[in-house]
């Protein structure tokens, strides 16, 4: 009889006396509390990591322009990295060829399309100078462009 008192009932067997039943109930309750505490700690740690990342990306991180060629690296002259020159969003002000990817790339000295393109041939001296192909602009359009981007030229 003492052998049965010393060893608790094995898993799956019904408890044969009151002390064994209480021990099983206590072990089950302890397992539930340990599982609940583990889940709570996991949720708390993931939430804390999300808060830290949100604070970092909203207050500390400053994006690096991918198309800069030989300028001083730093924040844009507008003062804020969230808006562009005329109040547009940072993604719209970055340029037409940028993507919304969250991947951060190292800045390049020369954009790849300009590096691969050969220099244009010199025009003959007797032909009139040919400028880039774009539509002619009126005087008010030039004023709007210079007002929208004061440091671009």
From Swiss-Prot:
Residues 79-101 have a biased composition (Low complexity). This is Putative transmembrane protein INAFM2. PANTHER family: TRANSMEMBRANE PROTEIN INAFM2-RELATED, ZGC:153157. Residues 118-131 have a biased composition (Pro residues). It comes from the Eukaryota. Its main location: membrane. Residues 1-23 have a biased composition (Basic and acidic residues). It comes from Homo sapiens. It is found in: Membrane. InterPro entries: InaF-motif (IPR029162). The lineage of its organism: Eukaryota, Metazoa, Chordata, Craniata, Vertebrata. One of its GO terms (cellular component) is membrane. The chain crosses the membrane at residues 36-56. Residues 1-24, 66-153 are annotated as: Disordered. Keywords: Membrane, Transmembrane, Transmembrane helix. It is a single-pass membrane protein.
């Amino acid at each position: 009889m003492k052998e049965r008192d010393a060893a608790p009932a094995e898993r799956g067997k019904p408890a044969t006396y009151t002390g064994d039943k209480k021990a099983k109930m206590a072990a089950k309750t302890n397992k539930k509390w340990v599982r609940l505490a583990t889940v709570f700690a996991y949720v708390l740690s993931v939430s804390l990591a999300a808060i830290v990342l949100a604070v970092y990306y909203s207050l500390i991180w400053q994006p690096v322009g991918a198309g800069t060629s030989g300028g001083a690296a730093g924040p844009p002259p507008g003062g804020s990295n969230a808006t562009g020159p005329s109040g547009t969003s940072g993604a719209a002000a970055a340029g037409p060829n940028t993507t919304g990817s969250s991947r951060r790339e190292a800045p390049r000295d020369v954009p790849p399309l300009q590096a691969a393109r050969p220099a244009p041939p010199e025009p003959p001296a007797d032909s009139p100078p040919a400028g880039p192909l774009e539509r002619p602009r009126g005087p008010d359009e030039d004023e709007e462009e210079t007002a929208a981007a004061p440091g671009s030229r």
